A protein has these predicted regions:
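Bacterial Sec-dependent N-terminal signal peptides
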Residues: 1-27
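Beta-strand elements of repeat-based all-beta scaffolds
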Residues: 22-528
Length: 528
């Protein structure tokens, strides 16, 4: 069992069933590393969360979230994360309509009672002193309407406020008579046979699109045109007074069929420029992308099975050589086999089937890395990757190459890690025909990675092993390279953590043929 615990304490008006008292219904963690016996302020509404870092209720992080009478978060106090032992506090302020108008940066508090509520004025003074800044907060302003939209946002820092540097927003509709608010309409047709035509068809009628205008601290403006369904039609960036437009053209189902880039709009819309600068998409009858084209490249086509899983794909280079790339999944939808084949992309007799695979009873008598494939006939398969899950029956395909090395970990592995990737085989592209790299992944009783054994292109084996703290952080990582000449090189990484499970120190050492070559730490660099 993985040793992780999180306790939550909700403090407000509690209605307890008969026979249950507050003492038996609530569990309060006894202490954390820096702040013993932490509880929230009893005169406030709060939620207390304790996250253990070592599987016990002695060491960890306590977070108390305070709320007002309407359940709105007003203050968050965290204990056990600061190396000095002080609390970390943050404030949130709302207006009468419950909109967040100010958020303060997280900073250290001088509060003497761990995780106790800090009065608003006191917390503000402490945060300004901590950051040595009169404005360590972000301000937001809204329209006066109850559902008012955001009008301005000013980032933290007194310097920004002195310069009135803020990000501003305003809202309008498209209008051809106004600068930067006009937009074009297009005639377009992207067909299933991959023929297409796109042309400009004049200006959009005024009021067709809603426009949100954002202006940052440097005066740069962004115009976003959306239709009545909230779908983006045009994104316009104003650069030195010039418009850089990106149009998103959609079909009647709201699916994007073309993206017209700023370079295309600058060069002019014709067939050659569309080929060079536009993104194009085609959909099948089930609204899945059946073909796509990126600027300057050929078409890429996709075919799916009855479970809507991608089974075949082909790019322009594959089309020239007459091959396709295939993907086969198991019954849980996990990708098991990837490779190339000589099937035609137009051959979709299998598309009404659920294409899947399962481990064969006789693993060595299958061309699919130990799997039997169902629902499709693959012609001349060439495997690129094979994944194995849930167990280690596949190991008989690879002899002793991927055997678990217990001497490296000192413990046994979980024999049936359900839902985990347990092995992988990858082809070496450009190497000897049939060459591949095989891997086995072993897990401990908590399903944490315990050891990876992998062959390499030099004919040797790499063994990566892990040891963990009680809180599931990596304490030791060791990589051993076993070479064909019988020698070995090893790397070792040691980690220590603070009470909040953050890396405190990291130590690295390297050995070759039993001799230590160098030794480093993350803070002291070279040690010996």
């Amino acid at each position: 069992m993985r040793k992780e615990m999180t306790f939550c304490l909700y403090m407000s008006y509690l209605l307890l069933p008969c026979g249950i008292t507050a003492q038996t219904a609530l569990h309060r963690p006894s202490r954390t590393l820096f702040n013993p016996a932490i509880t929230g302020s009893p005169d406030r509404n709060f939620v207390l969360e304790f996250t253990s870092t070592d599987g016990t209720d002695n060491n960890g992080v306590t977070k108390v979230t305070y709320m007002d009478g309407l359940g709105r978060v007003t203050q968050t106090v965290t204990s056990g994360m600061s190396p000095t032992g002080t609390d970390i506090v943050s404030l949130t302020e709302q207006d009468a309509l419950s909109r967040t108008t100010r958020t303060w940066k997280h900073g250290c508090s001088t509060n003497t009672i761990p995780c106790a509520y800090v009065k608003k004025e006191t917390a503000q003074t402490q945060l300004m002193a901590f950051f040595d800044d009169e404005a360590p907060y972000t301000d937001y302003s809204f329209e006066t309407a109850p559902d008012g939209r955001l009008l301005a946002e000013m980032a933290p820092g007194a310097t920004r406020r002195n310069k009135d540097a803020k990000k501003e927003y305003y809202y309008t509709v498209n209008c051809s008579a106004e600068s930067h608010l006009g937009c074009s309409t297009f005639r377009y047709d992207v067909r299933k046979d991959l023929s297409f035509s796109i042309s400009q068809a004049g200006k959009c009628a005024d009021g067709t699109y809603r426009v949100k205008v954002s202006t940052d601290e440097d005066g740069n403006s962004l115009y976003e045109f959306t239709d009545m369904g909230g779908r983006l039609y045009l994104r316009r960036t104003v650069i030195n007074g010039n418009d850089a437009d990106t149009y998103f053209l959609r079909n009647g189902m709201g699916e994007t069929v073309a993206v017209l880039t700023p370079k295309l709009m600058e060069e002019g819309i014709d067939k050659e420029n569309v080929e060079k600068y536009a993104y194009l998409y085609v959909y099948d009858g089930r609204h899945r992308i059946s073909a796509s084209k990126t600027p300057g490249s050929g078409w890429k086509r996709f075919r799916y099975d009855a479970a809507d899983r991608l089974v075949m794909e082909q790019d322009a280079n594959m089309d020239e050589t007459g091959i396709c790339k295939f993907h086969i999944y198991d019954r849980h939808g996990r990708e098991c086999i990837v490779g190339t084949c000589s099937n035609g992309i137009g051959d979709t007799d299998w598309s009404r089937n659920i294409v899947s695979c399962r481990l064969a009873d006789r693993l060595k008598n299958t061309p699919f890395g130990g799997y039997d494939v169902e629902g499709i006939a693959i012609d001349s398969p060439s495997l690129l990757k094979v994944n194995y899950y849930d167990g280690y029956g596949f190991l008989e395909l690879y002899g002793d190459l991927l055997t678990y090395r217990e001497e490296e970990t000192g413990t046994d592995y979980m024999p049936n890690p359900v839902s985990r990737l347990t092995g992988c085989r990858k082809a070496v592209v450009g190497g000897n025909e049939g060459a591949f790299i095989a891997s086995a992944f072993y897990y401990d009783e908590r399903c944490l990675p315990l050891q990876t054994v992998e062959t390499n292109i030099t004919g040797g084996t790499d063994v990566e092993s892990f040891a963990y703290t009680d809180g599931a952080q990596v304490a030791v990582r060791r990589v051993k390279h076993l070479m064909q000449n019988g020698k070995a090189a090893s790397e070792e990484y040691d980690y220590t953590y603070d009470s909040a499970a953050r890396i405190k120190t990291e130590r690295f050492s390297f050995e070759y043929d039993g001799k230590r070559v160098s030794n480093y730490s993350a803070i002291a660099l070279h040690l010996n």
